[in-house]
Structures are given as C-alpha cells and as structure tokens.
Design a protein with these regions (language model features):
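A short loop-to-beta-strand structural motif that recurs across blades of beta-propeller domains
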Residues: 43-45, 81-83, 132-135, 174-176, ...
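Blade-level signature of beta-propeller repeat domains, shared across WD40, Kelch, NHL, RCC1
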Residues: 250-299
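Short loop/turn segments immediately following beta-strands, especially the blade-tip
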Residues: 178-186, 287-292
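Conserved beta-strand positions in repeat-built beta-propeller and related beta-rich domains
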Residues: 28-29, 34-40, 75-80, 118-128, ...
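A short beta-strand motif characteristic of beta-propeller blades
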Residues: 10-16, 52-58, 93-100, 142-148, ...
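Loop/turn-rich, solvent-exposed surfaces of beta-rich toroidal or solenoidal domains
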Residues: 174, 178, 195-234
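Beta-rich, blade/repeat-based domains predominating
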Residues: 17-31, 60-75, 101-117, 146-164, ...
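Hydrophobic alpha-helical segments and helix pairs
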Residues: 91-146
Length: 299
C-alpha cells in the first residue's frame, strides 16, 4: 500500500494480547477502561491503560462487539444474538436474536448511535456475498432490519451534528454515507464518500470519527489506520502499524485524544507471525486530534 502522500504517524503496543481476532474497541468513559472483544476466543476484554491490567469475561460464543448500557452492565452482539452481560459475574441473558434462523452467520462490528440504540451487522462464516445484514436493537429491545444484502458488516460512525451515518461493508472497499432524519433513521439509499483503492490489496474494517468530522479507517491486510475527509474523499493521514491485520480503532483517554487500535493474528502463516510478533495486540497512537464520546445503550 502506498501511503507516501500523507504524513505517517506511529503507534505503540500497550497490550501484547496475542488475540486471534481483536476487534470492537470502545472507550468506557465512566470506568476509564477500554472495552474490546477477542472474537474467536469468545471473550470480552477490559483494559485499564493506567495500570496496563487487562481482564476477560467469557461470553461462551463468538462475540463481535460490546457496549456499556445506561444501567451499568454490557450489551454484546454475538453468534447467539444480543446478550446482556453483567461485567462482574459474567452472567449472561439473551435479549433477542434476529438471525436465529441463519446458523452460519454471526454478529460482527457494532456501535451505539447518539439516540442510544445499538447498530450491529452480521457476516457469514464463509463470507457468502449478500448473506448478511445490518440490524438495530432499539431501546425497547426489539430488532429492526436496517440494511440487507450485506457481506461483511463492519465500521460505523455518526457525525457530531447527527445528520450523517457512515457504514462499511468491507468487500465493497467503500464507505457509504446516509442522511438521517431527526430520529436517526436513514432517509436516502446512501452515497459513496470514501473508496479504498483496490491496488492497496486490503479492505476497510472498523472505523471511528474525530471531532473535526474526519473518518479513521482500519485497513485489514493494509498495516495501517488511515484518516479520510468524507466530504472530499481525500486521504489525510496514516498511522503505520507493525502488523498487517489492523481491525478497528476508537478514541479514548481522559481527553479522547488517544487512538486505540486493535489487530489480529488469525490467517497469518508461521513466518508472518515471526515477523509480526505483536499481531493480535492493542496499540495506541497520538494523532493530534480528539475524538467524539462513545455512546451507551439506553435500553
């Protein structure tokens, strides 16, 4: 991938977790902790950047994303559906499973919108094109289908003024932007605002947005997190990573000015793992801009 057109930034590893597929970072501001998931190990991570300590909650099934709730527990989107998880005991309860009939699908990336609802998308274990969907779990605990015909549902972000939703279906190499009404529902079919060049031989994965409205996109197989202007489609910056499978990112820290980055080691050959010993770890980059506060589930 050629990112020579932008000033490269650097990241450093803060937790050499060795996760097969670390994903879904979420800054839990009330606890000053980073929530993240180790999808294939079926567990939720809670990382304290101040002490460097990390603990896990076993979920019992592949978990794609996790967010805190207004009541202080956790909401996870998993292969078994939407689960409420008590962070101390690990006790789990099923809320709803909108794809219970799709045995080969699991939930992947997800986030809460500014209205306190969880958006989470699915993917087929064999990456069957169009076999997945994007769902929204409303605060009444009912699921609503937001987009069908998805292949690998991934990054989500909302603009600070609540006018725009950004969404990634990874194999398309595109970020779609949807106009929203005052209730946060899409009012158009979406337009392409960012496109990852096919020549880079990577796909867009997780995504976050900063206080200036710019998108930060993790490049799976691209060894980088890249910053883009959704208005012009222009790439503005790049965080160089020491591992190829960069999965997602979010802003955290007391001032939301640290970019936390997740990575993976799955699908890497032994010689690649030798060259990428920190693959599967959590990283932090100082990128010179702050992010927006993450939202909790209001239900």
């Amino acid at each position: 991938m050629d990112v020579s057109v932008v000033r490269p930034l650097q990241a450093h590893c803060v937790l050499p977790a060795g996760a097969h597929l670390a994903e879904g970072p979420h800054w839990w501001a009330e606890r000053s902790q980073l929530l993240w998931v180790d999808i294939e190990a079926s567990r939720i991570g809670l990382f304290d950047p101040r002490s460097g300590h990390n603990s896990f909650i076993d979920v019992g099934c592949h978990v794609g994303c996790v967010v805190p709730t207004a009541s202080g527990d956790l909401l996870a989107a998993t292969a078994d559906g939407f689960l409420r998880v008590e962070p101390t005991s690990g006790k789990r309860s099923l809320l709803h499973h909108p794809e219970a009939h799709c045995f080969d699908n699991r939930f992947n990336d997800g986030k809460c919108d500014p209205w306190g609802r969880l958006w989470a998308g699915t993917m087929h274990y064999e990456f069957v094109p169009g076999a997945a969907a994007l769902w929204r779990l409303d605060t009444n605990l009912q699921s609503r289908l937001m987009r069908s015909g998805v292949t690998i549902s991934n990054g989500l972000a909302w603009s600070a003024d609540r006018r725009w939703l950004y969404f990634i279906d990874s194999p398309t190499l595109q970020v779609l932007r949807f106009a929203l009404d005052q209730q946060g529902d899409p009012i158009d079919a979406g337009t392409v605002c960012v496109e990852i060049p096919a020549a880079w031989n990577c796909v867009p994965d997780g995504m976050t947005i900063d206080a200036e409205g710019m998108l930060w996109i993790a490049l799976h197989d691209g060894s980088a997190v890249t910053r883009w202007d959704p208005a012009s489609g222009e790439q503005l910056a790049s965080v160089e990573m020491p591992c190829s499978k960069v999965t997602s990112c979010c802003f955290g820290g007391a001032d939301l000015d640290q970019l936390f980055i997740t990575t993976a080691r799955h699908q890497l050959a032994p010689d690649q793992l030798e060259q990428q010993p920190l693959a599967g770890g959590l990283f932090v980059a100082e990128v010179g801009v702050a992010g927006l506060p993450a939202h909790t589930f209001a239900g």
